[in-house]
Amino acid sequence: MLLILPEITLTLIALLGQCFALMIPNKNKIIYNIVILLCIISIFLTFKYSSYEGIWHSFATGINIGISKSIVLLFTIVSLIIYRDYSNLIGEAIKFEFITLILLSIVGIFVAISSRNFLLLFCGMELTALTSYALAGFKLDDIQSSEGALKYFILGSLVTCLSLFGISFIYGFGGSIQFEDILHQLNNNSEIKPGLIIGIVLFLSSIFFKLASSPLHFWIPDVYEGSPISSITYFTSAAKIGMVIVLFNISKLIIGNYYPINYNLIKIIAILSMLFGAFGAIQQTSLKRLMAYSTILNIGYVLIGVILPNQEGYKAALLYILIYAVVSIGFFTCLIMLFGKDVDKASFKTIQGIAETHKTIAALISIVMFSMIGIPPLTGFFGKYYLFYQAINKQEFTLAYCGIFTSVVAAFYYLKVVKAMYFSKKNSIIKLPIQYGLLLINYLVLVFLLFGSFIILF
């Protein structure tokens, strides 16, 4: 029971909160704030200082797993605060279904992070996927949201079939669904069955799809464009971090030193993601679609760290995805504070000249863009430097050069945002009331981007 206490706690918070919200509909805001407070307290339940594998060696706990879960939950809480303040800003009633879906999605991520066999991993990933489809289509009166969610659901269902097909291959040719058994066969067996390799590749396709890495990235621009901004902050932070940790587990606990998958396959996907993400964003005018391609690009960078055969590679990748999650949240909260209910229409045209009327927000967006480019001494520079340094240190020159090249290409459209704000003709934007939750998040992002490098170094 104690083994799955965080998962049970979050499930109860989600379900009981939903029941109270239905019974006392005029108190949704109070219930919502109580649930956020309970989620903050739940962070402490994720820490387990002793490593243990229970439920027939299928579910693991430990200090590293606890830290991973607490990071994911922390970013989830930020997304919930953004949704609350966004609803207040546009004068819309809080829909408690949003918090229920997100918390159940997090339970799925927690299960996936702790799982040590394929069936449990599949169940966790599918719980996350099903709730994500609903979050993508949460704007019921918006045809773009429904279209994006439908595309996401159809493609996600196809990838689910592939992952199940992969599990059947793994069990059929490997004789087990336990991670340790498959790891032993891949790393200690001179005659590896091709069916086992096919099964692992098919299962990996579902991870790459959820990460939006190329060539399984085509869903993400439409989903980002149609999804509510609060859902996007969750997709681009907590959900992505969770899936990166799951990929780490698969790379370390299943594939191990079997280089045809753990090196060649992931290397190709990393290069494709960097190239598609960098060049795909150049022609975009919508800022939400721009960030979708930016996600593809940055997932490509994260995969560089996954490929590297040492612990430093994993640290570099995890650090980079954390920095990117913070940067993305900062950017989207700035857009909410600028445009309110018109945030979905945010584009290069609508941000023209905002530096004249919204100096603070324009400055923060500029810092976010400079951090994404990797300009020192911002934290984004440190993340890229550490990642590329580790790649060069392990003789991965192709990946490092591709990363540097695509960073230069991406600088074009990141600087284009700054140019539109400071050097273009002014557009009139109505000043919106201050939401202190969003303001606090923005200031924390600013502190992290300016001083995060020094905190990490020391």
UniProtKB/Swiss-Prot annotation:
Reaction equations catalysed: a quinone + NADH + 5 H(+)(in) = a quinol + NAD(+) + 4 H(+)(out)
Transmembrane segments: 2-22, 30-50, 62-82, 93-113, 118-138, 153-173, 196-216, 235-255, 261-281, 290-310, 319-339, 361-381, 397-417, 438-458
EC number: 7.1.1.-
Compartments (UniProt record): Cell inner membrane
UniProt xrefs under InterPro entries: NADH-Q_OxRdtase_suN/2, ND/Mrp_TM
Membrane association type: Multi-pass membrane protein
Enzyme class, UniProt record, top EC level: translocase
One GO molecular-function entry: NADH:ubiquinone reductase (non-electrogenic) activity
Record-level GO BP terms: ATP synthesis coupled electron transport
A cellular component term, taken from the record's GO annotations: plasma membrane
Key words, A-Z: Cell inner membrane, Cell membrane, Membrane, NAD, Quinone, Translocase, Transmembrane, Transmembrane helix, Transport, Ubiquinone
Pfam families assigned: Proton_antipo_M (PF00361)
The protein's role, per its UniProt record: NDH-1 shuttles electrons from NADH, via FMN and iron-sulfur (Fe-S) centers, to quinones in the respiratory chain. The immediate electron acceptor for the enzyme in this species is believed to be ubiquinone. Couples the redox reaction to proton translocation (for every two electrons transferred, four hydrogen ions are translocated across the cytoplasmic membrane), and thus conserves the redox energy in a proton gradient.
UniProt record similarity statement: Belongs to the complex I subunit 2 family.
Assembly mode: NDH-1 is composed of 14 different subunits. Subunits NuoA, H, J, K, L, M, N constitute the membrane sector of the complex.
PANTHER family xrefs: NADH DEHYDROGENASE
Protein name per the record: NADH-quinone oxidoreductase subunit N
Organism: Rickettsia typhi (strain ATCC VR-144 / Wilmington)
Gene name of this polypeptide: nuoN
